[in-house]
Amino acid sequence: MGDLEFKLNSTDIHQNSEIVGTIGVSYPGRYDGVVINTTILDSNQHIIYKSYNQKKISQHVSRLFINKDTMPENKAEFTASIEFEPLQEYEVKFRVSIIEQHKEIESKIIFAKYSN
């Protein structure tokens, strides 16, 4: 097992449903934080991040950085949603990476399905 654990509450996502992700880092070295990159394949739409570790946010972007200083016990939880109406089924790629001095140390990928 690696230094990064990443889970989603569900890989079956629907419009405006809450997406909850949990991240755990056991990397023994120094690191700056984790970054979550999300791509809705075959679409130019973005995920909307709602919060991380109980801190409210609203960013219409495909990337969220969580600083190590805001990760008690090297853990993070984020919530997000996708708001556009899916006219087809989309594949959503979530990629979480440990970042140290602008370099990626390790990453995990989860694919989810977005549909009506």
Name each model feature, range by range.
Residues 1-116:
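C-terminal beta-sandwich interaction modules and adjacent acidic
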